[in-house]
Amino acid sequence: MGAEAVVRLVYGEETPSGKLSVSIPWCVGQVPVSYWDVKTGHRMVETNPENRFTSRYMDIPNEPLYPFGFGLSYTEFTITPPIFEKQEREDKIDISCKVKNVGEVPGAEVVQCYVETLCAPVVRPDRELIRLSLIHI
């Protein structure tokens, strides 16, 4: 099955749609690079966009080599900003967006929804995945 899948991808019969579930660092010294880290004292420096953090690496970029969610495809998608709608009688929020295939071939896109807890009785990760959906267009 594996070889057949690779052949179908190489010949364009299928479109790759996978995304990285982790960040890939430039070198081992950047590990861990993840969204599951809890909040620390490092804050972005807003005054100088070239020096985004209070600390930085001297020989490699601060950003990972391949960031979380990176993926390749034969097509391209656009996703509108999310729309939030609070339900009147329930303690829940509906979140929606529109996904459009702007490429020339059919494909699949993973739409992911993350939350950030600003104030909680316990320390929470910076971002937590709460919902995802695979859209074939």
State what each model feature region is.
Residues 1-108, 112-118, 122-124:
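Secreted, periplasmic, or luminal enzymes acting at the cell surface/secretory milieu
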Residues 136-137:
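Conserved small/polar residues in nucleotide/adenosyl-binding loops
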Residues 126-130:
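Outer-membrane beta-barrel domain signature, especially the mid-to-C-terminal portions
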